[in-house]
Amino acid sequence: RIIHSFIYVRLLLHPLQYCLWDHFKQLSAMETRRIMNLAHLLADLVANFVVSLSVLKVIEFSDMRTMTPKVILHFRIFFKVFLTKYDDEVVLSAFKRIASTPELEGLRVKLAVFLHQHLVKGLVQAADSGISDDERMMLMRRFAMVKKAMESNSSVF
């Protein structure tokens, strides 16, 4: 929570974004615990509107050379935490923020594909993935909700 108090100083937003980008570049070499911690931190920052999902625009979700197993693990953890830990309104608002920006069309498409391939498909295929049926259903519902939100900036409710 300390980071939230610093974020109110607008001058620190860009250095934080650059710091996150530097960490994203190092994901393939990180230990699993550090990957998990970064995913949880990122989920908290996005959920509290400290950073936008647009911070992910530097990630080439469709490039198989950069999407190593550790990078995929990081973003699977991030999206699983973000989509299950926070309220519908928070999740919807975060995705609507990138839906209203035409320049982020490519990011929206890549996110939808990544979520479908690495989160939803895995939920459907692996009934024994260590998550409850309730959590699985919540993730499926949230995926449908955010996909709809990214496709249009009209109200989903």
Predicted segments, located by residue:
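Alpha-helical interaction scaffolds
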Residues: 1-157
